[in-house]
Amino acid sequence: MAGTRGMIALAALAVLAPVAAAGADEPQPAQEQEQAEPLQVTVVLAHPDDELFMAPALAALARQGARVQIAYATQGDVGPGVSGLAPGKALGEVRLKEAFCAAEALGAASVASLNRGDGTLGVNAHHEGSSARKLLADLGLWLAETDMILTWGPDGGYGHADHRMVSAIVTQIAEARPAAERPKLLYVGIPAGSLPPVQEMADWAVTDPALLTENIAYTPADLEAAKAAAMCHVTQFDEASRKGMMGLFDATMWRGKVHFRPAF
């Protein structure tokens, strides 16, 4: 959510690592091996901290047994937030650590950084060698086996160009797949009339509730996981905002479930 600051590789892969792999190599009982494969959920976002916009839903999916993997198109290396750090590689490394912290809190299985340049996805997107073209190639391979994709809607939340481009690129990949192979693609949204009463979110996009036909309900424990994830993003939000953000979202735009609309 780069931009809401006072509130509240394949060679291209710079990072692709499990969040919690304890016991992963231990032999499993035969009956467990025979169980159906877990739901593969891929969350594609622009920057570390974007996951907060749907955080309790991710915790709920992981708790229910889904394998949740989070892919960030960039490391957020030009968004210092409240940190005072200079834009650049060092900031990106810190923000990626924050992303791992948040993913662990939410129970995600893995985090990937595609590292395609914060703030560059909309620059000459149709040109050969552009960040957008490279991201399209990255994700085309990376999304091949997923069952469900969660991402920004066309509005990008509050219109951030990187958010919009991530949504568009993911949609382009999904719409080209035959129906039998197409993953379920869901855009996260804010129901009209439910924006938090804070100035920093006054211009965020809202969606007609009639279109938000998919919802992921969460428990108090999932919300606590989301609160823990928010506390990871020290560079982006002051302490009061980190402590209060998830509770505010829960009381206004979520109310026990995160809202999505199907792309198709």
What are these regions (language model features)?
Residues 20-23:
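Sec/Tat signal peptide C-region and signal peptidase I cleavage site
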Residues 9, 25-44, 129-264:
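Metal-dependent de-N-acetylase/amidase catalytic core
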Residues 25-144, 172-176, 180:
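Active-site rim/loop-helix segments in enzyme catalytic domains that contact anionic ligands
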Residues 1-8:
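Bacterial N-terminal signal peptides that target proteins for export
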Residues 9-18:
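Bacterial N-terminal signal peptides
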